[in-house]
């Protein structure tokens, strides 16, 4: 992707789509599918046609079907090395704990979800790349947009994105990351297509205002996630995720899913135009 196009993309996303260590998943399969399907429904015809073409070249059926693909690479003997090489691109840790993105410390050598998005959006938008390269980039972009909107994939604590924070949920032992990945979403007792319909029926999501002085939309999305994690009450003091916690934070999780879907659609519309 040319430098001028990268700058234009950054400006576009900032104006129209404001912006844990270890091998962990974000949202789980249900959340990633919801984000992908919400985005699919908001694609322009030209972008949708290009997505379909790339998916067909990849042998895939739908955007939702490939949304969790990066999480399964390390379990695939043929893709294990790619999974290992991209493992750090699923998340980031705010080192100073203040949720202020400082690239040299928060994304050293571009090995964080912000760097992952920058890398694969550039490949996706490069028409000189092969269909295989661009299809692979598409799958990473879909997944990483979902990842960066899961609050615990851009946290400010040294607890492996909540994996080390043990909680009781529904009478069973768990951890806070798993609760946010999927456990809270499952309390709706809806399959992902019906869940997507429910969220889509809420209408257009209100986009947060840009956070100055950032000119990197992906970093802004990470800062938003971090601010949720840093708020009082996000980590339950008694290590118990009760009905009151779910009532408070399930709408927050659903808003993040809706934002991710909208932003992914706008990103693909712009990149594939």
Locations of regions flagged by a protein language model:
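Bacterial N-terminal signal peptides that target proteins for export
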Residues: 2-12
């Amino acid at each position: 992707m040319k430098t001028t196009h990268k700058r234009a993309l950054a400006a576009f996303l900032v104006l129209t789509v404001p912006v844990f260590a270890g091998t962990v998943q974000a949202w789980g399969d249900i959340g990633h599918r919801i984000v992908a399907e919400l985005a699919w429904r908001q694609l322009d015809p030209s972008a949708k046609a290009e997505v379909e073409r790339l998916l067909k070249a990849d042998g895939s059926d739908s955007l939702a079907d490939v949304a969790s693909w990066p999480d399964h690479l390390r379990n695939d003997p043929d893709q294990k090395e790619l999974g290992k090489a991209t493992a750090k691109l699923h998340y980031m840790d705010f080192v100073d704990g203040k949720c202020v993105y400082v690239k040299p410390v928060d994304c050293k050598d571009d090995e964080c979800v912000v760097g992952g998005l920058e890398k694969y959006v550039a490949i996706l938008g490069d028409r000189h790349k092969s269909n295989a390269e661009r299809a692979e980039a598409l799958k990473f972009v879909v997944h990483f947009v979902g990842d960066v909107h899961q609050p615990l994939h851009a946290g400010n604590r040294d607890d492996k994105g909540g994996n080390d924070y043990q909680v009781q949920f529904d009478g069973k032992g768990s951890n806070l990351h798993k609760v946010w990945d999927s456990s809270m979403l499952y309390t709706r007792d809806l399959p992902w297509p019906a869940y997507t319909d429910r969220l889509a029926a809420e209408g257009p999501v209100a986009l947060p205002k840009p956070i100055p002085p950032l000119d990197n939309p992906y970093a802004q999305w990470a800062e938003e996630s971090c601010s949720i994690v840093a708020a009082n009450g996000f980590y339950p003091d008694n290590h118990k995720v009760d009905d009151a916690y779910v009532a408070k934070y399930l709408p927050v999780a659903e808003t993040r899913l809706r934002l991710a879907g909208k932003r992914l659609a706008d990103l693909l519309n712009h990149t594939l135009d």
